[in-house]
Amino acid sequence: IYLDVITNFRYNQSVTNLTRDAIQTKIVGEVNSYFAVNSGKFNDTIRKSKLTSKIDASDPSILGSDIDIKMSARFTPLQNPTTGNFVRTDYTINFINNIQSPLMQVPSISSDRFVVNGISCSIRNAPLHSTTLQAIDIQGNVVISNIGNYEPTTGKVNLVGFLIDSISSGNTYL
């Protein structure tokens, strides 16, 4: 399980000699420091408000910051060792935590891009409070209407008969 931390900040250029990149480097240092102290042990709790306060206090020019923290899990799709082609199979990805219950319009589940039948796709849960997973193209059109489901209370993501052509990022995992 990985935590993806996306931080946006606002700062006042007139009260600092630092460049935006230099302030960003300070912020990355604060984020790394926070996670070094507050994570890695059983039952650790990450407090966004405390992390935001540390970021805001890291330089007097920072006016405020916004943080988005997402859990991510990686899995490596199975390949035929002889041909190198991906193989159709089922996958269960266990987040070991609850996953956000499905919302009306905003997906609770998303993935990196991959190619299916020559179309660049990603995974999302279907709209309207659904736990059904779909493959969608870049414009949000449904390419495959049901590739599995997720269980919010157990943190399990189930992909059924999942088969891709390639992984768009060039990584070996999704």
Residue spans for each PLM region:
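Acidic, low-complexity glycine/serine/threonine-rich segments
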Residues: 1-92
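Extended beta-strand solenoid/passenger and fiber regions
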Residues: 50-52, 56, 68, 72-145, ...
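Surface-exposed interaction regions enriched in Ser/Thr/Asp/Glu
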Residues: 129, 138-174
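Extracellular/lumenal ectodomain signal focusing on beta-strand-rich modules
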Residues: 6, 64-66, 118, 154, ...
